[in-house]
Amino acid sequence: MMHMTFYWGKDVTILFDGWRTATWTGYLLSLVALLLASAFYQYLEAFRIRVKLLAGAKPASIPPPASSDAARAPLLLPSSAAGRWPARLATAGLFGVNSGLGYLLMLAVMSFNGGVFVAVVVGLAAGYLAFRSSDGEDLVVVDNPCACA
């Protein structure tokens, strides 16, 4: 019978029938594996965001307007999306892998075991701290390194 409320114990089925824990050693190794998978989820998300930002950092093919034409210049410059297909495919692939891993972590938490829940949450927090909480959170890729631009 599947649990419908949180419980604490070493006997848990995680994701499928082949991943059952009956000993404390197996249970603790499973919790470590879930913690590492959760941290890896955060790493993949940070990597996907960096790839997406770096792919969009290519300079525009249209030069900036002269100061006299600034009032008539378009607000958005057209981007050349033709050369960005490999980067778009890479970010889509990373998004798919990351989504799949996220859903697997959600299903593991749905075992309603308290240790599994804590391991996933601690892994997500540790991964966020390690890979996504730096000052580059609001990372903006600038094509012109001049501070006055």
Swiss-Prot record:
Membrane topology: Multi-pass membrane protein
The entry's keywords: Copper, Copper transport, Ion transport, Membrane, Transmembrane, Transmembrane helix, Transport
Gene Ontology cellular-component annotations: plasma membrane
GO molecular function: copper ion transmembrane transporter activity
Residue ranges of the TM segments: 21-41, 104-124
Classification via InterPro entries: Cop_transporter (IPR007274)
Compartments where located: Membrane
Known function: Involved in the transport of copper.
Family, as annotated: Belongs to the copper transporter (Ctr) (TC 1.A.56) family. SLC31A subfamily.
Protein known as: Copper transporter 5.1
Originating species: Oryza sativa subsp. japonica
